Amino acid sequence: MKTSEKDLRINKGVIRGKEIEIIVDGESVKAFEGESVAAALFANGQRISRSTTKENSLRGMYCGIGMCFECVMTIDNIPNTRTCQTFVREGMFIETQQAEGKWKTV
Amino acid sequence: MKNNEVIIIGGGVIGCAVAYYVAKKGINVMLIDQPKRGRATSASAGGLWPLGESIGLGCGVIFHKAMIEKGLLPADSHIPPQLPKSFLDFAIQSNEMFPSLTGAIKELSGIDFEYEETSLLFLMYDDADVAFAKTLYGNCPCGNSRIDWLTPFEVKHSEPAITHNILGALRFNGDNQVNPYALADGYREAARKLGATIITHTEVTGIKINAGRVSGVETKAGFFPSKYVVNAAGAWAAQVGEMAGVEIPVYPVRGQIIGTEAMPKILSACISTNDCYIAQKHHGEIIIGSTTEETGFNTDITPSAINSLCKGAVRAIPFLEKAKVKRVWSGLRPGTADELPILGKVKGVEGYINACGHFRTGILNSPLTGLLISEMINEDQLSFPIEPFLLSEERLQSLTNNENSNHKTSIQ
Amino acid sequence: MKNRKPIVIIGAGPAGMGAAIEAARAGASCILIDEGRFPGGQVYRKNSKEFQVKEKEMLTAEQKRGKKLHEELEEVSDKIKILTSTSVLGVWKNREVMWSSNDASGVIEAEQIIIATGAYERPVPFPGWTLPGVMTVGGVKSFIKTMFIKPGETALIAGTGPLLISTANKLHDIGVNVLAVLEAGSPSWASPDFINQWGDADFAHDIAADLLELKQNNIPILFNHTVFKINGKDEAESVTYGALNPENWKPLEDTTKTVNADLVALGFGFVPNTELTELAECKHEFYPGIGWTVIRDEWMQTSQQGIFAVGDGARISGAIIAEEEGRIAGIKAAQNCEAIQAVDAEKRSEKYFSRIHSFEKFRKHLNEVTSVKSGLLELATHKTLVCRCEEVRLSDVDKAITEGAGDLQSVKLLTRLGMGACQGKNCSPSMGMYLCEKLNKTAYQVGRINPRPPVKPVTLGALANMTITKDSHQNDSYDAINTGGYYEK
C-alpha cells in the first residue's frame, strides 16, 4: 500500500469507519468507509483531480458541495464523476482524469 | 456608408448562407439578426441526410411511429410519406456542395465546420422495420446504388457499439454530417471577409415598400435602405413576411434534443431508428433527437420526450446507459405543410425574396439555397430549377388549406 | 381530507427541514428530497454515519440550532417520505418535479412545491483561482466538519462576510497555520459597536464570538484587502495580495505582497441557487451588489401558483431566517392542501413571522455589508479564465462584446461561456456584473444564462428508466430510493 509521507486526517474526537483500500492511478491507497473520494485523496496529499480539455490545466476540488464539477475523476471506468459527492468503497478504481477521460465502450 | 443592395433578415444557417453566396458575387449585402431562443440552427444535430430525409428517416420515421401509436395512422402503414423527386434532387445537389464548401469557408473565415463523411444507418429492430427497409431498398428514387443492406454481422463489425439485437441495417452512403453552429458561424465570418455587413442583436420592425417595390428595412437601430430584402427568418418567417404584406405559411415545429457529455469516438456513422436519431459530433458529445411537435413558439422541454429519446438511444447503443446527459433543449423548425422550402420572389412585391420554410433540412439545403438566391439577385442562370419551391398562388392555397399536413397534430 | 398529491420539498437544509417539519405536523402528505446522504444541507450537515464523533461538551450556537432542527425532523420522520441521495433535475410550472437516484428517474406531480435549494459562493475570477488548493470557504468548512481532514497546511482566507472568520477559526482548530483573513470591505459587523446595536439577533452573537476567537487565535484580519493572484505550477503555492480602494474595491496595484500558502479559501458572499425557480418560470428581481432573488409574498409563495421558494435559495439571509421561512411555507402549503384551516395556519405561523420581522432590519443591514463592489472585477486580466468549465477567458468575452453581444445569452452563444457542467453558476454572476459595467446596462438588460434541465448530472440509463407518477398514492416509484437510513428506527 502506498504510504504517503503525510496523512492529513484529524483523529482527535473521531473514530472513522472501517479501513479499506482504494486504487488510485494504479496504486493502493488507504481510505475509511464514510469518506468521500475527494476526502480520501486529500488525506493522502492528492488534491489534483483532473486536467482540462482545452488547455490541459490542472484542477481540484473547489466548491466541495457538488456544484462546480472541478473535482470530477474517472471512477470505476465512468468519467466525470464528482469525487466530493461519491463515497469510497473497497476496491474502488479511481483515475486522475485527462480531458474527457477514458471510457470502456464495448 | 455604402449602399446595400441586399438586406437579409435572419442570422440562422440560411441567412448566413445567403449572405455568403451574395457577398461572393461582389454584391453589397447586410445581414440583420436578432438571436432568438429556439432558433432551429442551434437545436440541429447537423445531419446532412439527403436520402434519409427524402424518404422519411431522421425525424420522419420517429414521427410516423408516434402517429401509429396514437392511432392516427393505420398500424400497417410502415412507410412514412416520401417527399417529391424535386426535393431529393435539390438535397442531393446541395449535399454535393459541402466538400468544396468546407475548404472555401475555412480559407476565408478560419472556421472548420467539421464536415464528416459518416453515412447514415437505419437500424431494423423487427419485421416491420425490415418490411420498411425492403420498400426503401427496392424503391429508392435514386436507385439503390447509394444504399447497402447490412447483415447484423456487418453492423457489428463496423459499429461495435450498436446493439446486437437487430435484424440488419440500411446504410445510406453520402449522408453525412457537419457541426451546425460552426457552419452558420463559418458562412457568417466568410461573408464578413467578403465585405458583408453583419448587424447582430438588432430587431427588425418593418419592411419599407414604395410603389410595390422594397426600399429598405426599419430596425430598432434605424432605417437601412436596400433594393432587395431576403426573408430568412426561420420559424419567424411569417411575421417578417407580414411586414412586406406577404403571407408566408411557415409555422414553428418544436424539436427536443439531448446532448451527452463528451465521449470517446464510439460511432462512425449517424444512426436513425424509429425511436430517435443519434449522431456523435466532433467534440465527442452525442446528439439524440428529436420530437416533432406543433406547440407554437413554446420552447419548453418535457419529461416524456426526454424519456422516450433516452430509451431509444439506450436501445440502439446499450453502452450509452452509463453516459450522462449534459443538456436537453429544443428548437423551432420552420415548418411547412408540404415539407418543402419556400424560395424565391413573390408576385406583387418587387425585391422581396423568400429563403424560408426549410423545416428539418436547413443545414443540408443551406448551400444550394444561398447559391440560388445569389443567382436570382445577380440575374444569373439558376443552378437548379426553382419552380417547385416558389410560393405560387396555387401552392399558397394548398399550404394554407392543407388538411393533410402531418404536423397539425401535436405529438410528444 | 381528500386524497391529495403530495407537497414536494426540494432541499433538506434548514429551510427545507423547517418546511417539512411544519407540513408534516399539519398532517399534509409530504416528500423531502435532497442530493446528500442525509438531511442537514451545508450548514447543519451531518457526519457520515460510518463515523463515530464524540460530541463536544460546549456546542456552538449554530451546532445547537442544528441539533434541535434534526431532532424535530426526526420526531415527524415517519410522516415524511425522505428521499436522500436523490437529485431534482427539473421543475415545471405545472408542478411536475423530475428526480433521479442512481439508475432510476421519475416525475412526481406535486400539489405544492417548496424550493429550498440554498446558495453557493459568488465567484470572483482572478489569476490563479482555478489552481488546486483554492477552495470556497463554505466548501472548506463543511469538508472539515464532515470529513475531519486538513485541506492544507498553510492557509490564507479572502473574500467578504462573517463566514471568513468562522472558517479561519475552524482551520486553526485543526492545526492549519492560518496566515490572515483578508476582508475586502471594512464592514460594521467587525466593529465593537456591532454587538451593542444588534445584540438581540442570534447571528450577531455568533459573529461577536467568532471575532473574539479569531483574536485569541492571533489571526490578523486585514480590511480592504484581498487576493490579487494565486501562484503555483500544479497547485497553489503562494498568494499575492494587496489593498483595495475602500470606495469601489478597485485593486491598488502598488500595494502587493506575496506569501507562501498552499490553501486559499475564498468567499465573496453567496448567490441564491435559483435554477429551479427559473425553470418553473417564477419571477425574479435584482439587487445591485447582491444579485438575483426570487419574488415572494409574505407566505413565501412565488409568482407561480403552488410554488414556494424559501431560504438562501430565494434570497440570502442565513440559516436562522431560512428555517423560519421554511416553516411558514410548510404551514401555508399544508393549508393550500386543505390539511389545516386558514385560522390555524395564522396561529401556527405567528411566532415565525414575528421572528422574521425582528430580523428584518438586521437582514437589510447584513445585505448591505455583505454585498460586493464592482471594482473586484478588475482583478481579472485578459487571460484570466472567467468560465472554469469551458475555459473561456475574459478576452473571449471582450471579443464577443466587440462583435455585438449585449447580454449573457449572446455571449454564451459566441464563446460557450456557461455551457459547461456547472450551467453557468461559476461565471454568470461575475460576467453579468461585468457586462453591466462595461456596457452601462441594467442586470435586466444583460439577463441571465438560462438553466436547462437536467440541472444535476444524470445518466441516459436513469432517464430511460423513468416513472411518471400520476397518482402518487399508487406505485410510488421512489419507494425503492434509499433514505440514507438516517432516521430509521
Give the label of every model feature segment.
Chain B
Residues 4-31:
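N-terminal Rossmann-like FAD-binding beta1-loop-alpha1 element of flavoenzymes
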Residues 12-13, 235, 360:
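Residue-level detector of alpha-helix initiation sites
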Residues 17-24, 34, 44-53, 60-80, ...:
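Active-site substrate-recognition segment that forms the wall
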Residues 47-154, 313-314:
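Dinucleotide-binding Rossmann-like beta1-alpha1 core, especially the glycine-rich loop
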Residues 89-92, 122-132, 170-189, 300-305, ...:
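Short beta-strand to alpha-helix junction loop
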Residues 169-228:
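Helical element adjacent to the flavin cofactor pocket in flavoenzyme catalytic cores
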Residues 317-412:
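C-terminal catalytic lobe of FAD-dependent flavoproteins
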